[in-house]
């Protein structure tokens, strides 16, 4: 059985559906048929509002028909169709929504008097429709305007229908009982439609108040402020309030904006960007907007409370983006607006942001968090903001005069200016990667022009207030030159070394980009000039030339146009050949550029990071970041995306990295920890190492691969290892400090050098090895060439003949190790004696670690002694006289290329702790073998013309 309430609901829906049908034919069709004049914009807008209202009415009618159908099914088959099947219960929210949409459309028409304006176009027709309208409305008087009658016709049936909904649903809830499974649905629906009644009353009141406002304003103000969706919430003419410092004549609070009227001026503030701050007393409260702040005052505390409450709730409602339901300030959402919010605003006050539109996060009236700035001239900035200024990482795009050309700055910002690390791609195709301060290049940085530029340049070094200053390296690819030295005010200034692609290099003092005073000029044939000369290498003034053969020419030099170089001086042909160290191996730059002061911009940024306590938010700004960069022309919006590696995700949080250092302090564990850190390009130590690698390659690779720079390079590698150890110590001290533990004591120089050579240098040397070893190769090219000739010659000897040639005592020959095949004699066997020692020595070139190379040499020595002991059948320690010939034999058979470069690199880079020890002894022995093989008798000794076939080998 169905309840009486369900039957009443059915009758209610039938009546309302029929009423909607009559309204459609009686009201909507005539209204929509009367089109506005073409010159009447307000008429066209009213027509659109009426069309929207008609559409909402149709949707409401359709839902009523569905509800009616569900009720009929329920009453026709009560046993089969449950109460929960009623549309009014199972889809109460949907039914509510169509009512809300109808109310919204209706109140928009009310707010702008759309009905009154539409009626005017067919006033005679509507006056004749009063009788028909009485069929729809109860209590319609014969007096009053037709517009008012239409308002009632479109509102009264709905209000009555919702009222009956509530009464019948409440009654139905009582009928079904508390235990009925559908009771909650019934109560929920009754509550919704009860709230809808309150919402409808509020909306009608606001629309009526808004409609009454417009006639009180001038036509100019009305044109600016009047929109169908806008509702008036409060007017200072109703509740007086004073606004300072603007002294507004009238204050209007709408549901989307706060409007202050001051004479002919209109000040409009988007409520989404209005912050309410209570005052110190009951007579004042403050409003904060992106560019202005106001105080609201009133002599009536109660009136001020009304204003403060309504502004606060209006801001909350605007931020939520939908009207509060059922009334303003109601609902489950917080009644206080959040201090952090998102919004868009165009700045108008004079300043850097003038005419710029900011869209993003705000905090108390200031851009704060992530956001985007766009200027009318095409400039864009995307990034982090703090208290109204660019602060943190940001990308700035600046258009240039040329079409589709932009300067793109991917940088860290501090209080509105670039500060910290950044990558800038200019419209000229230049790219700068380095540090900034107050918007200017400052600290370490690399500026590189495009390869196709008229004059391709690359500068790697230090900057000061936008200019090259301090130590730096510039490569001029067009001239084939590389300058290594000091700069000031964007010019070469101070000591410097110039290296050319042709192999010529010189050292001197520069002033304002010009060389002044005497210098040193080394040519590719090892001629040496000491004196004054010009940038184009023309000898002028007094000087001395030392030729490779030892001849010297000392005097005055000059040049005459068309006649070349001329000189007046003394040519000394009796001089002895010069010491190789004074010409061929002359090193430039040492002592002129103290190694500890060359790359302070790189070390300094890391020290600043440590001094600041290794904060995560400064990690990128001080240590740099990596982005994918391309020189290809891209659309402007694509520049605003930075595929920046996120350090927190890929390298771990700073706290985790510091914790790892604390857990690995024992020597063996520490080396593994350092290896892991240095191999990770996102770890602070790994970042520092890669920046140092960049400076090293910029100085010594390519054109810089000159033998006269080997001394500079090898001391630089040692310094980098020392600085990396200091960097590790700095991180460790921060880790201890964060844990509240006592810091480690300062190291003395001896302990520090021991740790650097044993722990750090073996780990960092591979990163610099390619460029460094190339310099050693060039420096020892002549000796290595002689050595190569020697081992090539010695390789022609069979084993027995070579042992004899090297005066190895016969009782030490390991002939019993040889296994002869048929028709083979001992005298013809080759590369079999001391094979284990030879293979061991060959492993020297498989590692770059000096200590591991020395360990290979030690094992080689052990293999030689083990072979001799096996031959003699007893333990035997080789004296130096016996060791050297055997070692020469092993070296000649190992055929290690560039052994001289290997030996000198090992000696320069080995731990000073080994000086005077076994490793030093063995390295000296190897060096003696190397020098012996270079001798003329080793290189040019002729083999016997025939071999005796009867020799008993």
Swiss-Prot record:
A GO cellular component entry from the record: cytoplasmic vesicle
Subcellular location: Cytoplasm
Pfam families given in the database record: MORN, PH_alsin, VPS9
Domain VPS9: 796-942
MORN-type repeats, residues: 358-380, 381-403, 409-431, 432-454, 459-481, 483-505, 506-528, 529-552
Domain of life: Eukaryota
Keywords recorded for this protein, A-Z: Cytoplasm, GTPase activation, Repeat
Keyword Signal listed: no
Disulfide partners: none
Key word Cytoplasm present: yes
Biological process annotations from GO: endosomal transport
Signal peptide as annotated in the record: none
GO molecular function: GTPase activator activity; guanyl-nucleotide exchange factor activity; small GTPase binding
Subcellular location, principal: cytoplasm
Subunit structure, as described in the record: Homodimer. Forms a heteromeric complex with ALS2. Interacts with ALS2 and RAB5A.
Function: Acts as a guanine nucleotide exchange factor (GEF) for Rab5 GTPase. Regulates the ALS2-mediated endosome dynamics.
Record's protein name: ALS2 C-terminal-like protein
Source species of the chain: Bos taurus
């Amino acid at each position: 059985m169905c309840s009486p309430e369900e039957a009443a609901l059915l009758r209610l829906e039938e009546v309302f559906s029929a009423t909607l049908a009559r309204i459609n034919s009686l009201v909507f069709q005539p209204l929509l048929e009367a089109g506005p004049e073409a010159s009447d914009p307000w008429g066209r807008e009213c027509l659109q509002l009426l069309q929207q209202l008609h559409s909402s009415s149709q949707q409401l009618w359709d839902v009523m028909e569905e509800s009616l159908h569900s009720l009929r099914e329920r009453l026709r088959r009560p046993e089969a169709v449950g109460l929960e099947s009623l549309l009014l219960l199972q889809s109460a929210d949907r039914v509510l929504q169509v009512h809300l949409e109808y109310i919204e459309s209706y109140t928009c028409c009310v707010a702008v008097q759309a009905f009154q304006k539409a009626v005017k176009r067919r006033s005679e027709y509507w006056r004749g429709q009063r009788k028909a309208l009485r069929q729809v409305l109860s209590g319609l008087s014969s007096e009053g305007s037709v517009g008012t009658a239409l308002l009632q016709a479109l509102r009264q049936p709905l209000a009555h229908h919702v009222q009956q909904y509530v009464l019948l649903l409440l009654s139905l809830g009582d009928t079904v009982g508390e235990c009925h499974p559908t009771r909650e649905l019934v109560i929920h629906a009754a509550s919704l439609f009860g709230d809808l009644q309150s919402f409808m009353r509020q909306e009608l009141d606001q629309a009526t108040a808004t409609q009454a406002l417009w006639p009180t304003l001038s036509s100019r103000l009305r044109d600016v402020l009047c929109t169908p969706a806008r509702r008036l919430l409060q007017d200072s003419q109703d509740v007086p309030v004073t606004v300072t410092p603007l002294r507004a004549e009238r204050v209007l609070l709408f549901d989307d904006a706060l409007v202050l009227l001051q004479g002919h001026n209109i000040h409009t503030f988007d409520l989404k960007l209005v912050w309410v701050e209570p005052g110190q007393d009951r007579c004042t409260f403050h409003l904060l907007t992106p560019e202005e702040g106001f105080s609201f005052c009133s002599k009536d505390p109660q009136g001020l409370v009304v204003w403060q409450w309504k502004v606060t709730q209006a801001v909350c409602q605007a931020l939520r983006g939908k009207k509060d339901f059922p009334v303003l300030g109601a609902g489950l959402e917080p009644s206080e607006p959040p201090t952090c919010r998102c919004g868009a605003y165009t700045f108008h006050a004079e300043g850097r942001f003038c005419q710029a539109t900011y869209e993003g996060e705000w905090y108390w009236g200031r851009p704060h968090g992530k956001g985007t700035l766009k200027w009318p001239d095409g400039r864009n900035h995307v990034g982090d903001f703090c208290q109204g200024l660019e602060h943190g990482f940001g990308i700035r795009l600046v258009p240039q005069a040329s079409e589709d050309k932009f300067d793109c700055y991917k940088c860290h910002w501090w209080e509105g200016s670039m500060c910290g690390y950044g990558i800038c791609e200019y419209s000229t195709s230049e790219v700068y990667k380095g540090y900034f301060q107050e918007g200017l290049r400052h600290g370490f940085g690399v500026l590189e022009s495009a390869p196709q530029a008229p004059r391709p340049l690359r500068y790697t070094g230090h900057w000061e207030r936008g200019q090259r200053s301090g130590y730096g390296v510039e490569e001029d690819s067009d001239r084939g030159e590389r300058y290594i030295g000091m700069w000031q005010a964007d010019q070469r200034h101070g000591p410097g070394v110039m290296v050319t692609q042709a192999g010529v290099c010189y050292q001197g003092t520069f002033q304002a980009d010009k060389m002044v005073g005497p210098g040193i000029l080394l040519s590719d044939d090892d001629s040496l000039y000491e004196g004054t000369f010009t940038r184009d290498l023309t000898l002028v003034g007094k000087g001395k030339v030392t030729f490779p053969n030892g001849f010297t020419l000392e005097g005055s030099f000059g040049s005459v146009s068309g006649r070349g170089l001329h000189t007046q001086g003394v040519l000394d042909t009796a001089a002895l050949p010069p010491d190789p160290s004074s010409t061929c191996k002359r090193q430039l730059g040492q002592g002129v550029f103290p190694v500890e002061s060359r790359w302070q911009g790189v070390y300094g940024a890391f020290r600043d990071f440590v001094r600041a306590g290794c904060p995560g938010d400064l990690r990128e700004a001080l240590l740099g970041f990596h982005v994918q960069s391309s020189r290809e022309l891209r659309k402007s919006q694509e520049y605003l995306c930075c595929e920046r590696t996120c350090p927190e995700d890929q390298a771990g949080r700073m706290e985790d990295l510091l914790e790892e250092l604390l857990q690995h302090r024992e020597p063996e564990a520490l080396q593994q920890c350092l290896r892991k850190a240095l191999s990770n390009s996102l770890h602070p130590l790994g970042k520092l190492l890669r920046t140092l690698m960049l400076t090293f390659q910029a100085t010594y690779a390519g054109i810089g691969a000159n033998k006269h720079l080997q001394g500079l390079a090898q001391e630089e590698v040692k310094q980098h290892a020392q600085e990396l150890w200091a960097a590790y110590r700095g991180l460790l001290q921060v880790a201890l400090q964060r844990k509240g533990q006592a810091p480690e004591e300062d190291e003395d120089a001896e302990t520090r050098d021991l740790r650097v050579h044993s722990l750090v240098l073996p780990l960092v040397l591979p990163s610099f090895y390619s460029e460094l070893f190339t310099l050693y190769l060039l420096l020892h090219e002549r000796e290595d060439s002689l050595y190569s000739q020697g081992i090539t010659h010695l390789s022609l000897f069979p084993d027995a003949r070579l042992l004899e040639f090297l005066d190895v005592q016969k009782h030490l020959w390991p002939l019993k190790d040889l296994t002869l095949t048929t028709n083979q004699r001992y005298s013809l066997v080759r590369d079999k004696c001391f094979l284990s020692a030879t293979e061991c020595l060959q492993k020297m070139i498989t590692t770059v670690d000096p200590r591991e190379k020395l360990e290979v040499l030690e094992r080689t020595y052990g293999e030689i002694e083990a072979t001799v002991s096996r031959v003699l059948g007893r333990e035997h320690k080789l004296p130096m006289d016996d060791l050297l010939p055997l070692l020469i034999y092993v070296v000649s058979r190992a055929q290690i290329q560039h052994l001289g470069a290997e030996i000198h690199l090992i000696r320069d880079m080995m731990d000073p702790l080994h000086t005077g020890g076994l490793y030093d002894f063995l390295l000296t022995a190897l060096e003696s073998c190397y020098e012996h093989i270079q001798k003329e008798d080793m290189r040019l000794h002729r083999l016997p013309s025939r071999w005796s076939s009867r020799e008993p080998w």
